[in-house]
Curated annotation (Swiss-Prot):
Monomer. Keywords: Porphyrin biosynthesis, Transferase. The porphobilinogen subunits are added to the dipyrromethane group. Pathway: Porphyrin-containing compound metabolism; protoporphyrin-IX biosynthesis; coproporphyrinogen-III from 5-aminolevulinate: step 2/4. One of its GO terms (biological process) is protoporphyrinogen IX biosynthetic process. The modification S-(dipyrrolylmethanemethyl)cysteine is found at C238. This is Porphobilinogen deaminase. Its EC number is 2.5.1.61. The lineage of its organism: Bacteria, Bacillati, Bacillota, Clostridia, Eubacteriales. Tetrapolymerization of the monopyrrole PBG into the hydroxymethylbilane pre-uroporphyrinogen in several discrete steps. The keyword Isomerase does not apply. It comes from Clostridium botulinum (strain Eklund 17B / Type B). Binds 1 dipyrromethane group covalently.
């Protein structure tokens, strides 16, 4: 095979993430690859909140179509955007590693989160982030904003917000770590399921899958699979009020989860053998559901 074609979203972050995978392929196999840029439904409908336009697969379906049409050998996704069940034609061939999983606060004026004024306006499009912000500071006014990192930063200025909440992973991959004012403790302010992880999706039995399988990160796979199992048991998606944190502790996996039940955020944790990661995620969900 002379060249691999990798489908991805058009955003700057999606392209940077795909270039990370392209670099790994080049160093491991000395094989060239190129990007196929796709505008997804989630990218087209920026004026509507994600939970109103339907959660599952908004950033994935259009890219999967390129795989079905054999226009690309693989797709690179942020795993937090991937529904817990992928269509039978596809597989998540590799989870390639996780960047910093934490959420961060970017201040419009270099004021730390704990010091922002009473009634401060904080921008986020995530109901998970909004709910956890309210738990920390019930006085905050949550302002829904959507778009890529650059768009949200621009909206923070235009709408005179006191700050916004974003994922550390995206900022670090873009080289914008210097914008971060505060990091939230991921055990207290739980990230999205699979936050910070990159996944490679292929058609089952695709002729190029072997290249992507070589990029699997075992530890990241264990934690992401556990978190996705947790989400699946709750029948949630990336726009539900679900958060998860997991870490490998020697031979064990420790996991914390949150879920909204009747307007109340329920938080539980679990510890068990890491080889039972999928079952652990399921049990944590059952523990939360009571």
């Amino acid at each position: 095979m002379n060249e691999l074609i990798i489908a991805t979203r058009k955003s700057k972050l999606a392209q940077v993430q795909t270039e990370i995978i392209m670099g790994k392929l080049k160093s491991k196999f000395n094989i060239d690859s190129k990007k196929l840029l796709i505008v997804t439904e989630g990218d087209r409908k920026l004026d509507v909140s994600l939970n109103k336009i339907g959660g599952k697969g908004l950033f994935v379906k259009d890219i999967e179509l390129a795989l079905l049409n054999k226009e690309a050998h693989a797709a690179v996704h942020s795993m937090k955007d991937v529904p817990f069940e992928v269509s039978s034609e596809f597989e998540i061939t590799a989870i390639t590693g996780r960047e910093d999983i934490r959420d961060v606060f970017i201040s419009n004026g270099d004021i730390s989160f704990k010091d922002i004024k009473k009634g401060a306006k904080v921008g986020t499009s995530s109901i998970r982030r909004a709910a956890q912000l309210k738990l920390l500071r019930s006085d905050l006014e949550i302002v829904p904003i959507r778009g890529n990192v650059q768009t949200r930063l621009k909206k923070m200025e235009e709408q005179n917000l006191d700050g916004i909440v974003l994922a550390a992973a995206g900022l670090k991959r873009l080289g914008d770590e210097n914008l971060i004012t505060d990091y939230f403790d991921p055990k207290e302010f739980l990230p999205a399921v699979s936050q910070g992880a990159l996944g490679i999706e292929c058609l089952k039995d695709g002729d190029a899958n072997k290249y992507f399988e070589a990029l699997i990160d075992a530890e990241a796979t264990l934690t992401v699979e556990a978190e996705r199992s947790f989400m699946k048991e709750l029948q949630g998606d990336c726009h539900s009020l679900i958060g998860a944190y997991s870490e490998i502790q020697g031979d064990d996996l420790y996991m914390i989860g949150i879920y909204d039940i009747g307007g109340k955020i329920v938080k539980k944790d679990i510890l068990g053998c890491k080889t039972n990661n999928i079952e652990l995620g399921k049990k944590l969900a059952q523990k939360i559901l009571g």
